[in-house]
Amino acid sequence: MNAKVVVVLVLVLTALCLSDGKPVSLSYRCPCRFFESHVARANVKHLKILNTPNCALQIVARLKNNNRQVCIDPKLKWIQEYLEKALNKRFKM
């Protein structure tokens, strides 16, 4: 085989092997880029706390009335109280 063909073939195969998975820009993106700050506690069916190494605290709520998922601002007073109560319950001796 011609040396140029071998080099091109090796480069193409290397590029294919390195391109597996998501692009770096997508794999490090935080799930919650925008927060809802006017979500009533009574309207929340379920809360999910996302723990990602490269993002701040992120809380996703499933709403009762339309089953929609929204990211809730973790600075809301009722969220702070909920988290404090959950942590106290978990680490209570």
Swiss-Prot record:
Monomer or homodimer; in equilibrium. Dimer formation is induced by non acidic pH and the presence of multivalent anions, and by binding to CXCR4 or heparin. Monomeric form is required for full chemotactic activity and resistance to ischemia/reperfusion injury, whereas the dimeric form acts as a partial agonist of CXCR4, stimulating Ca2+ mobilization but with no chemotactic activity and instead acts as a selective antagonist that blocks chemotaxis induced by the monomeric form. Interacts with the N-terminus of ACKR3. Interacts with integrin subunit ITGB3 (via the allosteric site (site 2)). The keyword Aminoacyl-tRNA synthetase does not apply. The record marks H46 as: Important for dimer formation. The record marks K45, K48, K64 as: Important for integrin interaction and activation. Changing P23G: Abolished CXCR4 activation ability, but only slightly impaired binding to the receptor. It comes from Homo sapiens (Human). Changing R68E: Greatly impaired CXCR4 activation. This is Stromal cell-derived factor 1. Changing L57C: Formation of an intermolecular disulfide bond, leading to a locked dimer. No effect on CXCR4 activation, but loss of chemotactic activity. Changing E36A: No effect on anti-HIV-1 and chemotactic activities. Changing H46A: Reduced dimerization in neutral pH. Eliminates the pH dependence of dimerization. Keywords: Chemotaxis, Cytokine, Disulfide bond, Growth factor, Host-virus interaction, Secreted, Signal.
